[in-house]
Swiss-Prot record:
It is an enzyme of class 4 (lyase). InterPro entries: Enolase-like_C_sf (IPR036849), Enolase-like_N (IPR029017), Enolase_C-like (IPR029065), Mandelate_racemase_C (IPR013342), OSB_synthase_MenC1 (IPR010196), OSBS_N (IPR041338). One of its GO terms (biological process) is menaquinone biosynthetic process. This is o-succinylbenzoate synthase. It comes from Salmonella dublin (strain CT_02021853). HAMAP family: MenC_1 (MF_00470). Pfam families: MenC_N, MR_MLE_C. Converts 2-succinyl-6-hydroxy-2,4-cyclohexadiene-1-carboxylate (SHCHC) to 2-succinylbenzoate (OSB). Keywords: Lyase, Magnesium, Menaquinone biosynthesis, Metal-binding. Its EC number is 4.2.1.113. Belongs to the mandelate racemase/muconate lactonizing enzyme family. MenC type 1 subfamily. It catalyses: (1R,6R)-6-hydroxy-2-succinyl-cyclohexa-2,4-diene-1-carboxylate = 2-succinylbenzoate + H2O. Mg(2+) binds at residues 161, 190, 213.
């Protein structure tokens, strides 16, 4: 016997979270909980403002329609990426397809004073991989900060993310301030320039490896082995169903590319599922899931070791 609940939620964000020039004051989303007999599966649907094509309200309408169809015996999935991902996760939990084993390691997202970062990163146990957002300030400053971190910590590797912020000139200004001897320890730089051709040229000219992120969600993108392209970053909330995520991971791995499963600032429930997906599909690769600290609370399932308060399901607004 099938049954389902849908919950709507809103989590206050820490001050200072800015996405594509807009301040994100709250993270808004939905949960779906599917039941079939004794089995239960959860999924999170939380379109990311400025990145997802669908709004929270559109996702809610699509989810409620899909849940009602599922209760009537339908086996299809919604079209909207965030809804398809959340629904497919709930089904994967319900059927036991999604393994329980999780990779709760996360490449720390580095913000703040560079001198403080050096101290923090130097004390990191094990493999030292960290992420730095670039393109928010002057390219020269970004280059100097990256160079400082790599110089101060000889075993540090950095993942950088520019979100297509730079013109070719700005990208070259960044590279100019990174010692060529350190560039191999830039694991990759996500989407440095506004176009893929400019990003490819940057990789060729500087020897700094790049990764595709936004490009994966463009209609003309195909997986190819290319000079200077080392990785792809997959954000499942923006991608679609779990099957589509698996297809992209397989296509990238077949070309020898590194695949990083990455957060779209999901709640703790969504992040714990992404940790399981990473352990399952990209074992041995550190996922990019260090975003929980941007929020003021957890929900339903806590992230191991987090001190943030965790709301129970009965504290959420139920829609169905």
């Amino acid at each position: 016997m099938r049954s389902a609940q849908v919950y709507r939620w809103q989590i206050p964000m820490d001050a200072g979270v800015v996405l594509r020039d807009r301040r994100l004051k709250t993270r808004d989303g939905l949960y779906v909980c599917l039941r079939d007999g004794e089995r239960e599966g959860w999924g999170e649907i939380s379109p990311l403002p400025g990145f997802s094509q669908e709004t929270w309200e559109e996702a809610q309408t699509a989810l409620l329609t899909w849940v009602n169809d599922w209760l009537q015996g339908s086996e299809g999935l919604p079209e909207m990426p965030s809804v398809a991902f959340g629904a497919s996760c709930a089904l994967a939990e319900l059927t036991g397809v999604l393994p329980e084993a999780a990779d709760y390691r996360a490449a720390p997202l580095c913000t703040g004073d560079p001198d403080d970062l050096v101290l923090r990163l130097a004390d990191m146990p094990g493999e030292k991989i960290a992420k730095v957002k670039v393109g928010l300030y002057e390219a020269v400053r970004d280059g100097m900060v990256v160079n400082l971190l790599l110089e101060a910590i000889p075993d540090l590797h950095l993942r950088l993310d520019a979100n297509r912020a730079w013109t070719p000139l700005k990208a070259q200004q960044f590279a100019k301030y990174v010692n060529p001897d350190y560039r191999a320890r830039i694991a990759f730089l996500e989407e440095p320039c506004k176009t893929r051709d400019d990003s490819r040229a940057f990789a060729r000219e500087t020897g700094i490896a790049i990764a595709w992120d936004e490009s994966l969600r463009e209609a003309d993108f195909t997986f190819e082995a290319e000079e200077g392209v080392k990785a792809v970053v997959i954000k499942p909330t923006l991608t679609g169903s779990l099957d589509k995520v698996r297809e992209q991971v397989a296509a990238a791995h077949a070309l020898g590319l590194t695949v990083v499963i990455s957060s779209s600032i999901e709640s703790s429930l969504g992040l714990t599922q992404l940790a399981r997906i990473a352990a399952w599909l990209t074992p041995g690769t550190l996922p990019g899931l260090d975003t929980l600290h941007l929020m003021q609370a957890q929900q339903v399932r806590p992230w191991p070791g987090s001190a943030l308060p965790c709301l129970k399901r009965d504290e959420l607004e139920r829609l169905l």
